[in-house]
Amino acid sequence: ANLAERAADAIGANGLLARVGSYYHDIGKLERPYYFRENQLYEDNPHDRLDPMLSTRIITSHVTDGIKLAKKYNVPPVLYDFILQHHGTTPVIYFYHKAKNNSNGDPEVRLNDFRYPGPRPSSRESAIVMMADTTEAAVRAMTDHTPDKVEERIRTLMREKLDDGQFANCDLTIKDMNVIASTFARVITGIFHDRVKYPE
């Protein structure tokens, strides 16, 4: 939430809205929490026993499940876009590759079958939450958190989303994206910077 708010403020968007949208964007994961990596405390991963297409359906359903929960618990409608749009129409790449590897070259395995239903982000704030969500997960997986490596990874991820058309429906400029990337890098580097080691 801090990441999205800081980036939104930096480009003159609504930082508070981006922060609150960040709090609610993944509420759909509450329906099937153990199918999501961040909730798997042990080695057992239920996706190991499932067909990749079924896994994709379960993962992508957290968007529609989120909207159902939001309506049930009277979440303000202004937050619905964050729930619906935080993955846009991006593919669930892990399960796409798993299906390709299991297919023996079957041409029936199509990338578009592994995409979220969308829609793509329609505001600067929902696009920022999309980028913050992607960035945070990817940077956590890195071993080298030096400022240059972090910013390089962030810019690569943003370029991939841009090339995939995810920002076609919102009014982000290239200048905005540069400011967002720099802000993300600064905030994340601050989180991962080496702590001072005190003598015992």
Model-inferred region functions:
Residues 162-200:
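Long, hydrophobic alpha-helical segments that serve as membrane-spanning/inserting helices
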Residues 1-147, 151-156, 160-164:
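Divalent metal-dependent catalytic cores for phosphoryl transfer on phosphate-bearing substrates
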